[in-house]
Amino acid sequence: MLYHFLYPLSAELPLLNVFRYITFRSVWALLTALLITIFIGPRFIRWLKRVKCGQYIQEEVSCHVQKAGTPTMGGLLIGFSLIISVLLWGDLTNVYLWLVMLVFTGFGLVGFLDDYTKLRRKTNQGLTARSKFLWQMVIAAVAMYFLVKEPAYSTVLSFPFFKNLQPDLGWFYIPFAMIVLVGSSNGVNLTDGMDGLAIGPTVVAGIVFSIFIYIAGHSQIAGYLQVPYVPGMGEVTVFCGALIGAGLGFLWFNAYPAQVFMGDVGSLSLGGALGFLAVLCKQELIMLVAGGLFVLESLSVILQVGYFRMTGGKRIFRMAPLHHHFELKGIPESKIIIRFWIMSIVFGLMALSVLKLR
């Protein structure tokens, strides 16, 4: 919005020419989302308490009993700050910006319905896994349909380390990308089981993809690093900046001991957005590295359930997702969180290193 109002005045006021730079607007999108989140956070948390949006705790995780009643649905705060920031600093004529907002909002709506159902039933059981998966797939399909219709966007799949291996999947690219979106969304959701555990790695992955997105939208840098160039993609860096800022602002209140939880409205929307960012910049497979922690958490659940069914009740882990396994081994929650953050940073650096390994 500010871009559309102020940049046209740059002919009379040369200082306003800075609004044409994506980097400038991305930094301010970050700062705006951060400040909005921190400023309205205390009032928002008090409101959640007043309307009794308290978290219900799994009986199996007895060490979390003291967290019962902590306000949830904090993802609404993330969403509000992010959307306001993007609307202020983004070029609202950019179709990719609107598509990532569609994914973020759509997945967030599914998460909101899940959280609302839990609160209404006064349990930790929300929407059924099948209905949640179905709605996620519908939103992903709609977003991908509009994305592949863009003339500048390609359905070619880029493989890390192999610059000449770029098969064109055609319409098969849509179901593949849908799996990336839904898998990423549920991966963040599974990771969100401790104070600050999910939002930290989400911010790290957001930083990684902000770099990939900016490069994908810059013809010269993309050509030099031999990554797919997508005209107009650089504008999505503004969304990445807002995501990072809103995430850091939320961490201010979600860090151990948490004053608020993001809920599914936060984890599903952020995870879906990260998956779509990977698709937008043609780094779908890099999501496995940049979001390595989410992959590990998801794999722990898949292995646990599969092994349990095959062996008639035996388990690989004491409890899944993986962070609960370490928790039940007696490792303090704060130490698990910091160690997982360190792992996410390492995964992020590994993902960025791929830029020079072609």
From Swiss-Prot:
Pfam families: Glycos_transf_4, MraY_sig1. GO terms for cellular component: plasma membrane. Its EC number is 2.7.8.13. This is Phospho-N-acetylmuramoyl-pentapeptide-transferase. It comes from the Bacteria. PANTHER family: PHOSPHO-N-ACETYLMURAMOYL-PENTAPEPTIDE-TRANSFERASE (PTHR22926), PHOSPHO-N-ACETYLMURAMOYL-PENTAPEPTIDE-TRANSFERASE HOMOLOG (PTHR22926:SF5). It is a multi-pass membrane protein. Its cofactor is Mg(2+). CDD domains: GT_MraY (cd06852). InterPro entries: Glycosyl_transferase_4, PNAcMuramoyl-5peptid_Trfase, PNAcMuramoyl-5peptid_Trfase_CS. Keywords: Cell cycle, Cell division, Cell inner membrane, Cell membrane, Cell shape, Cell wall biogenesis/degradation, Magnesium, Membrane, Metal-binding, Peptidoglycan synthesis, Transferase, Transmembrane, Transmembrane helix. It catalyses: UDP-N-acetyl-alpha-D-muramoyl-L-alanyl-gamma-D-glutamyl-meso-2,6-diaminopimeloyl-D-alanyl-D-alanine + di-trans,octa-cis-undecaprenyl phosphate = di-trans,octa-cis-undecaprenyl diphospho-N-acetyl-alpha-D-muramoyl-L-alanyl-D-glutamyl-meso-2,6-diaminopimeloyl-D-alanyl-D-alanine + UMP. It is found in: Cell inner membrane. Pathway: Cell wall biogenesis; peptidoglycan biosynthesis. Its main location: membrane. The keyword Metal-binding applies. GO terms for molecular function: metal ion binding; phospho-N-acetylmuramoyl-pentapeptide-transferase activity; UDP-N-acetylmuramoyl-L-alanyl-D-glutamyl-meso-2,6-diaminopimelyl-D-alanyl-D-alanine:undecaprenyl-phosphate transferase activity. Belongs to the glycosyltransferase 4 family. MraY subfamily. The chain crosses the membrane at residues 21-41, 69-89, 92-112, 133-153, 169-189, 196-216, 233-253, 260-280, 285-305, 335-355. One of its GO terms (biological process) is cell division. Catalyzes the initial step of the lipid cycle reactions in the biosynthesis of the cell wall peptidoglycan: transfers peptidoglycan precursor phospho-MurNAc-pentapeptide from UDP-MurNAc-pentapeptide onto the lipid carrier undecaprenyl phosphate, yielding undecaprenyl-pyrophosphoryl-MurNAc-pentapeptide, known as lipid I.
